[in-house]
Amino acid sequence: MKILENNKINLSLLNNYILQPKIFEKGTDKFWDDEHISEQMLNLHLNPDIEAASKTKETIDTEANFIIKAIDMKKGKKVLDLGCGPGLYVREFAKTGATVTGVDISERSINYANENIKPGYDNILFIKKNYLDINFRESFDLATLIFYDFCALNTSEQIALLSKIYEALKDNGYFIFDIVT
């Protein structure tokens, strides 16, 4: 059912979209595939001047360069970017020659990344998947979770994700994430 159908507004459906969720209330994956929401989220990701769905271009460049230097990212390294959105960090990591896998739940973001970030790079793979459902084994030198995603998870999801990331990392691998304090 759509909010606007046959020139009529479905007020109860509209109300569902404007209700503020309780803290750590479980949402649905369908949120990310809603045509209007996913389009607006992608537009926000791609706006280099505001921090709404992604960080500003200047911040992305600064953080990516810090991460690249901190782990000596180069060809032969394998990187997992969880919640990669349209691949803004993936692109920066791939420039080093590292093999980079980006995972995101939004089909629109993954499609954008495949069409606009991946061309010219044979060392990038984008996967449309909820990162809570990943199952990699000792594959990566680095896993990242950027833009405060960890804070949006409830405690059991945080524990489950940390376990999955631990399994995905090689011995002595790194997990870099940011939180709001």
Indicate residue ranges for each PLM-predicted region.
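Conserved SAM-binding loop
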Residues: 113-114
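A short acidic, Gly/Pro-enriched loop at the edge of an enzyme's catalytic core
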Residues: 135-142
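Conserved SAM-binding strand-loop segment of SAM-dependent methyltransferases
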Residues: 119-132
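N-terminal auxiliary segments of SAM/dcSAM-dependent transferases
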Residues: 2-32
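Conserved SAM-binding loop of SAM-dependent methyltransferases across substrates and taxa
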Residues: 86-97
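Conserved SAM/SAH-binding beta-strand->alpha-helix loop
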Residues: 106-108
